[in-house]
């Protein structure tokens, strides 16, 4: 295939896939993968790396959100120019060389994809273990059953998978928003958002504010990870030239607002000294502590429900998105041909 034909194929919107994902479905894939259990504890790492300065920690959450949004805008441009399944595999092929795209896709197939899905599934079962008497073997068996069930369900078409993703995202947001709004309205602490203590910390530790921000943003970026997965299913998005960038902007922008407000809500409930004491004692689940304070004994149940739903959405989102990269490698002719086959009825890669 010559270069002109190759570019023409990548830019046209005709496809064998079913374009069943709308804007909300796209937002659900992004939010479903991005918003995980980390919302309840990653704030501790950000605070720790900013010298326990509340104002600087919130700035870092916003900076990480803006970095993710800028990345999302770049992906929106790539996705509208080349609305094909495979995401970064396609982009790396075109920008550099097919070897680079294949290396990224093969690494994800061998380690990154299954490793991430397994880790999230085990973590989900560990949360349930605190409510049910389940052995270590039971946790692993439950995780395997979950992965197999999600995989089988996703074989019945992207419309069904997208619907579950949308429902799970809404369901996971309910407990998170309940905790956040309760904390914002009930919390009586007035957090000190000045940067004075950060300057003092920087001088005492022979560092700089910029270095502290850089380290803290790395921690907060982990919470934003996952937005790249939407482009993997670009070939299944309705009107991708409009809906793909819209879903990326709404999804990443909304998560940025949620993360910033949630961490501010924590500071509204827990006095700064208590936060510092918890982190120093390696009790990192600040969100859980807030839920227990504002909701009483029901707080732990609300948080656990939120964590389970969040991880379920993350697992389903990865099971939905990742096979499209392997499809793209096979379609390029660099991977097993069977991976490029779509189900004759449901039009999803099944191998």
Q: Which residues does each predicted region cover?
A:
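Helix-loop-helix connectors at the membrane interface of multi-pass transporters/channels
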Residues: 3-6, 10, 89-101, 121-142, ...
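Lipid-exposed faces of alpha-helical membrane segments in multi-pass integral membrane proteins
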Residues: 31, 35, 59, 63-67, ...
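Inter-helical loop and helix-membrane interface segments of multi-pass membrane transporters/permeases
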Residues: 48-51, 118-146, 151, 188-213, ...
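Membrane-interface "cap" regions at the ends of multi-pass membrane proteins
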Residues: 1-55, 69, 73, 85
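Hydrophobic, membrane-embedded alpha-helices of multi-pass small-molecule transporters
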Residues: 21-40, 146-149, 183, 202-265, ...
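Membrane-interface loop-to-helix entry segments
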Residues: 125, 138-195, 225, 248-253
